[in-house]
Amino acid sequence: MSLTSAAGIISLLDEPMPDLKVFALKKLDNIVDEFWPEISESIEKIEMLHEDRSFPENKLAGMVASKVFYHLGSFEDALTYALGAGDLFDVNARNEYTETIIAKCIDFYIAQRVEFIENPKEASVVDERLEGIVNRMIQRCLDDNQFRQALGIALETRRMDTFKDAIMKSDDVRGMLAYAYNVTMSLIQNRGFRNEVLRCLVSLYRDLGVPDYVNMCQCLIFLEDPFAVAEMLDNLTRSSVETNNLMAYQIAFDLYESATQEFLGNVLQHLKNTAPIPTALPSTFKPQGTTSEDGAKSEGDKSKSDEDITEETPADDKVERTIDSLNEVEKLHQKNIEKLISILSGEVSIDLQLQFLIRSNHADLQVLRGTKEAVRVSICHTATVIANAFMHSGTTSDQFLRDNLDWLARATNWAKLTATASLGVIHRGHEKDSLALMQSYLPKEAGPSSGYSEGGALYALGLIHANHGANIIDYLLQQLKDAQNENVRHGGCLGLGLAGMGTHRQDLYEQLKFNLYQDDAVTGEAAGIAMGMVMLGSKNAQAIEDMVSYAQETQHEKILRGLAVGISLTMFSRLEEADPLVTSLSSDKDPVLRRSGMYTIAMAYNGTGSNKAIRKLLHVAVSDVNDDVRRAAVTAIGFILFRSPEQCPSVVSLLAESYNPHVRYGAAMALGIACAGTGLREAIALLEPMVKFDPVNFVRQGALIASAMILIQHTDQSCPKSTFFRQLYAEVISNKHEDVMAKYGAILAQGIIDAGGRNATLSLQSRTGHTNLQAVVGMLAFTQYWYWFPLAHTLSLAFTPTCVIGLNSDLKMPKMEYKSAAKPSLYAYPAPLEEKKSEEREKVATAVLSIAARQKRRENADKKEDEKMDVDEDSKEGAAVKKDEEAKADEKMVTDEKPKKKDEKEKKKEEDKEKEAAGTSSEKDKDKEKDKKEKKEPEPTSEILQNPARVLRQQLKVLSVIDGQSYEPLKDVTIGGIIVFQHTGKAEDQELVEPVAAFGPMNDEEKEPEPPEPFEYIED
């Protein structure tokens, strides 16, 4: 018989005999889930029994009390009594009570552990009973093979002992290491603890049977430990095993893609010292000091600078030796170090990507021609120049500009600077000939000048050498010192900032600061941005103080705007270290400095997905009184979320419907930045109504640009709205009634969506998951086009070629093939535009009214008759015949303006009739032919790609190396980028890909006739 009340059992708790109380507690423990309301009225008695240490089953009393409090919803008390129950609390029990208490226990333990580690002096010691339950829980996970759960608890509770156990005890150690690395980089916000975990991962990678050098290197980049990286590379290059040498090259390529200039410089310096003959190494990169020779110096200057270098090198035994005196092992080591230096200095990567972009250029000039014909306003002229630069970014093809020199010459004043700087985007990465390319625009010693072209040329040099400026910095620095004109100084500052990005060089900073202190608005704006670029992520207290104090003093809004960006760049990726600066900037009375606070949050927490940062930005987005600050706050959300783009639409969806147009614009840009290149449908769904229906034109401008960022390199198969948006851009541009602002956005969008000859994507993180430093900086500077159009060019820093480039041991591209296991159309280039529209317009323009034509003919005929004095009858008849013919011709004109076409149609109809009459046999033949075509038409399910291959980001997952080739990759090809292959066949079997010349494959060159055959000229 089932119980209807617990009153009888509860009454036993008042009995004096302990055995009866124990009996009562055991019964209550069994029925507590059903009768907890009744038991709760006597909870005090149970609590007293628990606290009575002489009572034999005081732990059981704690267990009952814990369950009662759990049902009452008082989880903290429930946890306290569960801890008091000791071993009676079974962590392995599978019920709601146990799971809830364990969850609360872990949360409580995490809070105590974190507080104890971060504030050991103030925090109380962690409760041992809590730790006991957590330990049992971890052990349960390990016993049940729930290694990921154990690893998660270990990271949350900061237990490095458990972290190691969870990885090493698992069945798949490499898989667990990869999972641990991803979790560490995406979820751990605290910089100090993240570094501790990464150090642990490095030791685990090193202890594997075959050390995982690639991932070790990724961890060491985050740890900012260049010497450990250099040591690893040195060990690999000393090895006589070819695989180890090739692995060193692969690591060097990954390093160049992921690390800062300063980090690479330190690795290079350390590597040079380990070489058998350091002085024999090429000096392509010298960090923190004077840079190597640039193209502007003469041969004599070069030899002098080489002598200086050798003088600076300490005179030791290595200097006296020559290459010939080395043994075979040392020669190999020297050669390997030379190759590493060429890779780490960026020469090889930049040259290979340039080759790929030139070779694969599929930019559609017809798009630009259509835009050029449609625009009539100077702003749109500038936009078209910028769009052309984006479209040909890195391809070195300036075909469109050469074809339209008269049109280009319309650019005046600052538009001329923008146009000249666009050459820097087109020739991005074409570093060897950069000075020769820009020679005709660069400042010259003699002759007066407006300075717009010269400033643009210096800015262009910065764009060509962005984040890789060792060979051009000295030239730019000298030009900036010599500049007499504010326009030249403006371009010089921007160029120097881009080339010296992240070098933290004091001499560059001082020169830029000197230009800032001239109190010239135009120069000061560029200097402010450039100072931040040079001191990128340095958290240099002196630099921040200089910039903030000058920002508070200056009266020039332009200078303030430049400094707002510059200040934020100094805190790049500094996480919580930037909080004090953010707090002071956010509370400033000047709205431009408050805006700087928003940019600082964006830069400090870029890519972290930090909830704290997003909360702060959302608060400002809805509360600040200044529209610019609100717009910046919403835009900044995009920078925080670019590693988890799928979260961005839900965060900004309400802001996208705000009454404030600046907030709507910010929401559009945030979507563009966070979801760049993803083709995310949720993001496009938010942008589409903005583009079509928003009443404010600058919101439409932002939405158009953002849509192109998201749809870059997407086809209708991967994102159904792709063609719709391409057509929309063309419609907005050609519509005479559209506002200039919307047109500007549409023109830029056309350039962005086809960037890099349709071979580049927008990406704020590298393939290996690191923040793409120059891309984030370029994107932030691009958002400033709102105030200053020339800054739009910096978006080119975020364009990443989507290629897989295979290299052999000589760092050359061998002829080899990859297989893409997907239909070719899924990742194909968009179809080129046809030139139909312009032809139709010409025909319509030449239409003549038939009545007018007939009237003219009659008048002419009458005049001729009047002029003739004597007329024969024969001639009269002839004239009558002619008149009849003319009348017939007139009638013909009435019916159709294009008689030739009509004749052709009629002929076709007649032919069709003849064919129909030919009988059923021909029809049967036709049907057979159709069937054959239909059978041939099914698209192949895969395609073969030649090295170097254009492989889209979403295509990488279906990419593989074709079997049967004599090349084996040193890392997974699905990561993409530059991959070193080991050649397993004979050395003489290798066929190499022929390099192509820069300036791109010109259309004119293709049409040129062949030269005549050789012949002898004999005089008579």
Curated annotation (Swiss-Prot):
GO biological process: proteasome-mediated ubiquitin-dependent protein catabolic process; regulation of protein catabolic process
Record's keyword terms, sorted: Phosphoprotein, Proteasome, Repeat
Protein name in UniProt: 26S proteasome non-ATPase regulatory subunit 1
Lineage of the species this protein comes from: Eukaryota, Metazoa, Ecdysozoa, Arthropoda, Hexapoda
Molecular-function annotations in GO: enzyme regulator activity; zinc ion binding
Chain spans, region Disordered: 279-322, 855-950, 999-1020
Recorded name of the encoding gene: Rpn2
Bias type Polar residues, positions: 281-293
Function: Acts as a regulatory subunit of the 26S proteasome which is involved in the ATP-dependent degradation of ubiquitinated proteins.
